[in-house]
Amino acid sequence: MSSKISPHVRVRFAPSPTGYLHVGGARTALYNYLFAKKNGGEFILRIEDTDEARSTQESLRGVVDDLVWLGLKWDEGVDPVTLKDVGPNGPYRQSERLHIYKEIADQLLKEGKAYYCFMTEEDIEKQKAAAGSFAHLVSPYQDWTLDQALERLKTGDKAVVRFKTKNLVKDYIFTDLVRGEVKFPSDMVGDFVLLRSDGMPVYNFCCVVDDHLMKMTHVFRAEEHLPNTLRQLMIYEAMNWPTPEFGHMALILDEDRQKLSKRKGAVACGQLKDEGYLASAVLNFIALLGWSDPQGREILSVKDMLEVFDISRLNPSGAIFDRVKFKWMNAQHLRALPNAELWQAVAPFLARENMDLPTDPAWQSKSLDLFKPYMEILADAIELYRPLNDKSYVILPEADETLKWESTKAVLTSWKNLLQAHPSDYMTEEEFLKMQDEVKNQTGSKGKHLFMPIRVAVIGKPHGAELKTLVPLMKKSSLVARAEQALAKV
């Protein structure tokens, strides 16, 4: 087994388009991207779509869009817009490389390193029942000549192509860049399938062929792929191909130290985006699930990561997906954005609720200065801005008691008249407090008999947000209209 490989770094992220992009997949993509860019290499996007029943164009579109949202730009692979091949080592979809796998399988068959196996499912089950389910399959066809097998194929019988392992009696040892030395005894696996009876290749075979022909120098992937490595090393050896270096990353675990599952919250990048997580925060958070900054920083941009990323700092132990910390981290990224940029991110969430808010950039910036400290995710803006939306203003049943007080009508009348007399469209916090004092002077009302009716006339309920912060963001005409609505209920 040769270990000589090009020093020019080439790595890949190879998702299957059978669902969404999970945060674990996003972390794999990020580490490969950082490693490539840190070492002046290339990051390739390959699509492993040989599972015809489950692979969909919709899933592929979703995975590609999520990678684009995260900002992980690849150098070769499917085009992010057209999904067509871009690069000299394509096709980049395994479903378009079937002829390549067939050629390599034919070579292994001719060299006696693989064979056609005509065992049926029934044959295999019988052997398992007799030998025990943990025994390796022993095919009666492993010593057939290729000519014998080809003659039988002419009769219409179906066969898989199996890799022959019986002569490989030794340990397979490699240095995992995350876990150190890993040793596999060859008898861990029996003769494994390369091509199914319909000609479709299996994962381990495609993976080796593609990684070799696409000149991959390093393979960084999740720990769950570690058992696949033995079969892959055997194929590399049989083909006399150089092996890339491997690194297997620890699993991401939930708070109960179980494998992360969508049952306990969002784990799909698209869902996180819809909830209002920023791409920069997602990358920051997943980067620290198994890797640590040498300076101990918790808030990092991709630029920061690129300056210090070293694969040797990956931890082989499972990383906990702490959702509370994730929200906190998103809040730090959110609050660090310039107001104009943050408004662009917030606006789609407000638009979903059909909010009719001022378009003046100065007003938008002022409102964000007020609300930013209370936002952890972008969706938090919805409830913060709702009181400012005239379409959302309703007087709730909880205001009924306040509206029945004898003093309420005088308070609301004074409030409305002072609003109408105010010389400008908006007022400052100081002007609001003075106006509130003037209502007190005119009506003699104080305490809850002063504050609660005014709050009902502003937000539709007697308890809630501080008016001194909300009122300066509200147009005079809006405040007057709300006061009139409240007065009509007295």
From Swiss-Prot:
Its EC number is 6.1.1.17. It is found in: Cytoplasm. InterPro entries: aa-tRNA-synth_I_cd-bd (IPR045462), aa-tRNA-synth_I_codon-bd_sub2 (IPR020751), aa-tRNA-synth_I_CS (IPR001412), aa_tRNA-synth_I_cd-bd_sf (IPR008925), Glu-tRNA-ligase_bac/mito (IPR004527), Glu/Gln-tRNA-synth (IPR000924), Glu/Gln-tRNA-synth_Ib_cat-dom (IPR020058), GluQ/Sye (IPR049940). ATP binds at residue 262. The keyword Ligase applies. A motif ('KMSKS' region) lies at residues 259-263. GO terms for biological process: glutamyl-tRNA aminoacylation. NCBIfam families: gltX_bact. Monomer. Catalyzes the attachment of glutamate to tRNA(Glu) in a two-step reaction: glutamate is first activated by ATP to form Glu-AMP and then transferred to the acceptor end of tRNA(Glu). Belongs to the class-I aminoacyl-tRNA synthetase family. Glutamate--tRNA ligase type 1 subfamily. This is Glutamate--tRNA ligase. It comes from Bdellovibrio bacteriovorus (strain ATCC 15356 / DSM 50701 / NCIMB 9529 / HD100).
